[in-house]
């Protein structure tokens, strides 16, 4: 569902942000 999509997006966004900081 929508939560699954949100979790997938977060799984990619969080590491990407972590790389910059």
Swiss-Prot record:
It is found in: Secreted. It comes from the Eukaryota. Expressed by the skin dorsal glands. The keyword Protein biosynthesis does not apply. One of its GO terms (biological process) is defense response to bacterium. The modification Phenylalanine amide is found at residue 21. Keywords: Amidation, Amphibian defense peptide, Antibiotic, Antimicrobial, Secreted. Its main location: secreted. GO terms for cellular component: extracellular region. Maculatin-1.1 shows significant antibacterial activity against Gram-positive bacteria, less against Gram-negative bacteria. Maculatin-1.1.1 is inactive. This is Maculatin-1.1. It comes from Ranoidea genimaculata (Brown-spotted tree frog).
């Amino acid at each position: 569902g929508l939560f699954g999509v949100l979790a997938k997006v977060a799984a990619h966004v969080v590491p990407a942000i972590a790389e910059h900081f």
